[in-house]
Structure formats: C-alpha cells, structure tokens
C-alpha cells in the first residue's frame, strides 16, 4: 500500500473514531441533563440544537427532539362526562347537575397542535433514517393514541402498518429500551407480545373506536399467529364486551381453549359469557375447567 493510501486510511479511521466519540459525548450529556431537568427542562433545547448540528441524522438526537416538543405540547384540561369511567380512568370529582344526574370530571391531556406536529416531524425523520427501529415506530403510535383520546383511527393505522412491515420484511428489527441502553434484535414472538400490549391498551380505553381497534389488531395478529390462543380469545372478548354477543364470544373462547386449555383468563371470560346466557350446563363446564 502506498504512503498516500495509508494516510487516507488513517484519516478515515481517525474521523470515524472522532465521530463516534462525539456521538457518545452528546448522548452522555443528554442523559445527564435529562436526569436533572427532564425532557424539556432548562438547557435541553440548546443541547439538542447543538447535537443536531453535529449529527443531523442521529436517531437518539431525533428522539430527544421528539420528547422535547411532545412535553412542551402537553397540557391538561378538565372535561365533564356522563360515564363513570373515561379512557380507562376514574373521575377525580363527581357532582350532580340541576336534574340530580351525576356528572363526572376527568383531568385529561391536551396538546398544542403546532408543537405536536413538530414532535411528529422529528419522529418521521428518525423513521426515515432507521425504519427498522421498533421503539421509534412505537413512539409515533403512542403519541397518536394519547392525542386522539379514544378515537384512535391514526393510532390503529400506524400499528397495523407496523404489523405489515414487520411481518413481511426480511430485515432485522431492533428495539431500544431507553437512551441509556443498546438496541437489540426483536424476534417474531417478542413482537407478538408487544402487540398484545397494544391490544390490552386499546381494550382498556373502552371507547367504541378503541374496541374496534382491539378487534382489528387481534384479527390481524391472528392471521399471522394462528396458534396463539390470546389473539383468538381477544376476538371473543370483543364480542363479550363491545357487542354483548355471548354466543359468538363463546365460539372464540372455545377455539382459544382448544389451543390452551389451562388459560385461566379465557376460562373466566367464558364463564361470564355462559352466565350471561343463563346456560347452567356451560357454566358447569367452565367451572370444572377452572378447577383443574
């Protein structure tokens, strides 16, 4: 190798090491400041701005900018509702109106739309840079879920799109727990468990839109994981709670129990459906399964 080529190689190595060291230094400084002031505290915007000049395509930096704008965008407001449970929460105050009807008051998040859009733009850039980072994709879905307050059309669209991308791509997908950890490769089984968390959250919100999202996500996951008893049981739970169609609920619960006969959660739900139908024979059947 000629001396000129050796110099070029050495320069490239030095530049690479310097860039990595700079990246680590900004991330270290960010984590230290985050521990002291939070996502949007004093000095955070300046640090992120300087970081972005040095590393405009750093996923860690773009996530930091997302959290900064999202935190700045958030506020709270009090909303009156007739329901005794709203978005999975209980009211902080209940009063009676002039007709003697209970009015329940909830404190919920609200968002400044301009700052919320800024937060999403940072995430979109991170997804463009690293499309196979699940944690970044989840952040976008989670942001929409908080913003939409139970009418979760954009949330569902994002999650279903992610399911399609993950299940049809041959790429290795990574997940990073937080800014202090290293990303790891996610298996299909791990991804399935992550989607079960979304199913739970959709169901927990308890709105017509979220129940529909719960059903559609469970059906989509069942199409890929046909032997997973939980997704089949989820479909039964949709019919039990959202439709009050107890016969159809039992049909799916029985399918689920054929795959996993000792699933206590499914057995308990099937028992509820049997009692709703006032079918003592079925009730005894599920009670016996529960005791085994």
Language model features with spans:
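Start-of-domain marker
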Residues: 22-80, 108-112
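Alpha-solenoid helical repeat scaffolds
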Residues: 28, 60-64, 135-142, 172-178, ...
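Single-residue signature of alpha-solenoid repeat helices
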Residues: 43-44, 119, 155, 214, ...
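Alpha-helical adaptor scaffolds
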Residues: 184-251, 255
């Amino acid at each position: 190798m000629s001396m000129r080529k050796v110099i070029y190689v050495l320069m490239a190595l030095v530049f690479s090491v310097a860039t990595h060291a700079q990246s680590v230094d900004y991330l270290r400084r960010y984590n230290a400041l985050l521990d002291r002031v939070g996502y949007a505290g004093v000095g955070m915007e300046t640090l992120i701005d300087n970081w972005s000049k040095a590393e405009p395509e750093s996923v860690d930096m773009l996530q930091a900018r997302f959290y900064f704008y999202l935190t700045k965008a958030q506020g709270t407001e009090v909303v009156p509702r007739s329901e005794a449970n709203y978005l999975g929460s209980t009211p902080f105050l209940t009063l009676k109106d002039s007709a003697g009807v209970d009015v329940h008051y909830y404190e919920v998040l609200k968002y400044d739309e301009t700052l919320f859009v800024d937060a999403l733009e940072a995430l979109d850039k991170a997804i463009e840079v690293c499309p196979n980072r699940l944690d970044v994709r989840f952040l976008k879905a989670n942001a929409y879920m908080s913003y939409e307050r139970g009418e979760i059309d954009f949330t569902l669209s994002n999650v279903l799109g992610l399911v399609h991308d993950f299940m049809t791509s041959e790429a290795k997908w990574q997940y990073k727990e937080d800014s202090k950890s290293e990303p790891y490769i996610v298996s299909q089984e791990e991804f399935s468990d992550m989607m079960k968390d979304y199913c739970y959250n959709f169901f927990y919100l308890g709105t017509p839109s979220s129940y529909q999202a719960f059903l559609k996500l469970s059906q989509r996951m069942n199409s890929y994981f046909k032997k997973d008893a939980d997704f089949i049981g989820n479909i039964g739970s949709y019919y039990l709670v959202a439709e009050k169609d107890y016969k159809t609920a039992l049909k799916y619960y029985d399918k689920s129990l054929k795959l996993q006969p000792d699933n206590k959660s499914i057995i308990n739900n099937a028992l509820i459906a049997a009692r709703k139908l006032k079918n003592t024979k079925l009730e005894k059947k599920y009670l016996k399964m529960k005791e085994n």
